[in-house]
């Protein structure tokens, strides 16, 4: 059995997190300004690699906690991204997850340490690799899910007004519509 595994190629299994927040009527995305290669100085999603002793879901929770200090956050798997040349460093297949967090509850020092910044979803800079595709798919999933389940509450503080709730759901709908309008 060992020969079967050793005769097949190996590659990395990555995790990329699309972290959404809501502030002042706008959906924002937590992005990393990379201070490491490949693509140093470029904008990316927060990511990491699955370790031998963890599931992909546990790896996503770990990556999110390492960046934000938050645990028990709403997360959903977006999908697998495995184009052969998606990462110029090595052969990497990535599983993307999106997370919805209250923008006022994360560890600001930890985020600064990772050189991460909140960016309005409708004003995103160019992202590396296939990260734009991940964001697009996550936005579509979030909009779809928000239309049938109350997932938006994860983006709001414990106490909120009805106008904040309305503003949130309008922002979820408008941000996705805005994206689609610019693609055509």
Predicted regions and their residues:
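N-terminal strand-loop-strand
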Residues: 2-43
